[in-house]
A protein has these predicted regions:
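RNA-binding accessory domains that recognize and position tRNA/RNA substrates
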Residues: 1-44, 51-54, 61-69, 85-201
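Gly/Ala-rich beta-loop-alpha elbow adjacent to hydrolase catalytic centers
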Residues: 75, 79, 84
Length: 205
């Protein structure tokens, strides 16, 4: 799994949480080319959060062809905004932001939230929100203040959460990442730390 880093304080945590599921993950910078990403032969891509706003001229650059790959893509927070904007949705400032715990209503319709209880607690940390859902997408969870907490495309290849499933504050975060890795992306839990050390030794020899 390739994680594209847009400057989130939690990017390393995403990588760690994936590896804890015995799936190899690697972090690449936001300006990584499509060619360099595909050289890793990823099963899936995760777009991290970040402090920027997608509608600003100073927003991090990225290869937009990545978003059209025939691979499952999960956008987290800022990653959700990238996917929404790319597919024709609207992202705007909330004016005051949303930081801290929130409870979500699960609407169903996506494997991403399988086994996630209605009303469960999540961790929000964002200044922007999606105000227009892209055509061909649906809101699969909402927060108590009617923010789209999670979205999915009709083909289920594009998924996104406004909250952070990688942090321990999100009650079912582990389950959500597990759903994305195994039910949606069809990853196999066959990676171990010893495998990483073995490859590292081969590269140095």
């Amino acid at each position: 799994v390739i994680i594209i880093d847009f400057g989130s304080q939690y990017t390393q945590l995403i990588a760690r949480k994936i590896r804890e599921q015995n799936v190899f993950s690697e972090i690449l910078p936001h300006n990584a080319s499509l060619h360099s990403i595909m050289a890793h032969e990823p099963k899936a891509i995760i777009l991290s959060g970040g402090p920027s706003s997608v509608y600003e001229k100073t927003a991090p650059s990225y290869d937009k062809e990545i978003l059209d790959l025939d691979l499952p893509i999960l956008g987290i927070c800022y990653g959700l905004h990238i996917l929404a904007q790319h597919h024709g949705g609207c992202v705007e400032s909330t004016g005051k932001g949303e930081y801290g715990f929130a409870n979500i209503s699960v609407n169903g319709g996506s494997q991403l939230l399988n086994s996630v209880s209605n009303g469960s607690r999540v961790w929000m940390s964002h200044m922007d929100r999606v105000t227009k859902i892209p055509d061909g997408w649906s809101v699969i969870a909402e927060s108590s203040n009617n923010v789209a907490a999670a979205m999915a495309s009709v083909d289920s290849k594009r998924l996104a959460t406004q909250f952070h499933p990688e942090v321990s504050h999100t009650e079912y975060g582990h389950q959500i990442l597990k759903n994305f890795l195994f039910d949606i992306s069809k990853c196999k839990p066959d990676w171990t730390r010893s495998e990483e050390r073995r490859v590292g030794k081969e590269c140095r020899s």
